[in-house]
Amino acid sequence: MRYGNARTRYTTDLDTATATDPAAYADLLGAALARGWEGFTGRVVPREPAHPKDVPEEYVMRPFDVRLSYLGKPWCTVPLEVGHDEIGDADAADWIDLEDADAAFAALGLPSPGRAPLMPLEHQVAQKLHAVTGTGDRVRDLVDLQVMFSNSDIDLAATKRTCERLFAYRQRQAWPPTVEAREGWDEQYQALAEGMVVIQDVGEAIEWANALISRIATA
């Protein structure tokens, strides 16, 4: 959403954070979808959350299916994951003009979608660094981080403060961490990086990420 389809890793799902309870957020979203917009309506259906080992329940994203209809007929389902506000990541937003979406909406005769509130970049970077250096299989964050830093001027000092707070809050791995290759990353990374303006070799991408962590840690 931040950079447009031509410059980002394609994904069909949507992640969001809320300062309220995720269930209450889903209720409000469901009410808005029921009211509809330009012939589109929808409903929010809860899914069973994951149960990752040694991860407190309150840290686990709450999954939902957003089932959209157009003129009363099923159209598509969008997987949605709602997280809680950990360290103020839902307190403020970067408001972004959706140029690609605006053009697509205009071509279809729909009103402009307007601006979208996105999580501030320093929080996104901190969360992705925490994920890619954790025990999970998050090689995709190596691609996302390169896209973010090649397309945005990110405040390293602010990112450092956010990383320190997030890593201390989650109490999983210490800051600064180290990215280490995991089984299967070669093939997964190659598939994700193909056709994108990012480092094509996973080993070199890991070196880049660890150098980035050092830059942030000393900012």
PLM region spans:
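Structured mid-to-C-terminal alpha-helical surface segments
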Residues: R2-T8, T18-A219
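Non-catalytic nucleic-acid-binding interfaces of large nucleic-acid enzymes and RNP effectors
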Residues: D13
